[in-house]
Amino acid sequence: MPTGTSAEPGTDPVLILGGGLIGLALAHELARQGLAATVLSRRRSEAAGFVAAGMLAPHAEGLDGRLLELGQRSLERIPAWVARIESDSGLACGLRICGIVVPFASAAERDAYPTAAHGERLDRSGLEREITGIGPLWRAGLLFPQDGQIDNRRRLMRALERACVHRGVRFEEGCEVLGLVTEPQGQQTGEAPGEQLAAVRLRRADGQELTLPCREAVLCGGAWSSQLLPGLPVFPVKGQMLSLQGPIGALSRVVFGPGTYLVPREDGLLVVGATSEPEAGFGEGLTPAGQRQLQAGIDALLPTATGWPPMERWWGFRPCTTDQAPLLGKGPIGGLWLATGHHRNGVLLAAISAELVAGAMLGQQSDAGLLEAFHWSRFA
């Protein structure tokens, strides 16, 4: 890791501020494009990429507008993106385009769903065909065969980290970024007045504090992003989850119910999520109320799973914005880029976020309009 001395002009690596899924995806893409990248991460284990269920569900989640477009673009790119990660890492990522079923209490609710036109309509018999043992409350449904899942918790994160190493990305784990150092810009270049990123202040795992010069960095700090950039509209939404061990093949589709979803892995593990607790802030730990909510969701969606043995219980923090869409592209400081605020769609949007932000950093103009829709200035 570089010390406080400046590197040769033009050789400074791009600093990735955050080692979660989005940060790793971006570091890998930049390295593929020939740029040096260094990932600064306090504790990668706390990243949302390790605790999410891994759904790829732009249609099942009922997204709309530009966020739906962003999700669809990413979904299209994910097979090739995963193939590159698997090639660079030698590890499988657990991608399954297995389809997602959204159950409803009535056909009217089904037909009013924002993305109903993208799915196959199911009646009660169709629900029973797709989800063996589905609870009696549900009378209609939508099947989105184009949606799916990836095993982020056990496979994708490890594979992506190894792929980054393969591409020469450097890592500094246990490194806390304390602040950004800026300098005036525009005085000599004729650019509009403003601030230019000059360095980051950080504390390494051994306690050493230093100032690391840099001209470009990407803020991928997830729910903690506003701690580095006060005023950035990103806040934590706590989520609790659990997993059960079911029989292999007992459930082939993801089930996306109201307040609860069931994500079956190939080995029979059933990932159950998730509470949504914006009032919890960064409060850690499981709660009886949260676990009761998950259990009630299992009882309603798939009663047969109530007897399956529990495996894990965990929690994490989604990085949310007030419109529940990410912040992508140029930041409010020259040289600082944003890739954060993905809320519950970080796994889905990792591929397109890395592509768009890396492309913009390299001066590529493709999809500039889509990137602009997620610029931070929409909150200004």
Regions found by a protein language model. Give the residues of each.
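Beta1/beta-strand and adjacent pyrophosphate-binding region of the FAD-binding site
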Residues: E8-G20
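Glycine-rich FAD pyrophosphate-binding loop
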Residues: A31-F50
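Active-site lid/adjacent beta-loop-alpha segment flanking the redox-cofactor pocket in flavoenzymes
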Residues: F50, I248-G334
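Dinucleotide-binding Rossmann-like beta1-alpha1 core, especially the glycine-rich loop
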Residues: G54-G133, R139, G297
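Helix-loop-beta segment of a Rossmann-like dinucleotide-binding subdomain
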Residues: G62-L63, L91-V102, R124-R167, T275-E279, ...
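Helical element adjacent to the flavin cofactor pocket in flavoenzyme catalytic cores
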Residues: L143-G186, G190-Q208, L212-R215
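C-terminal catalytic lobe of FAD-dependent flavoproteins
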Residues: R153, W308-A380
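Central helical "cap/lid" subdomain
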Residues: G207-F256, E284-T287, T304
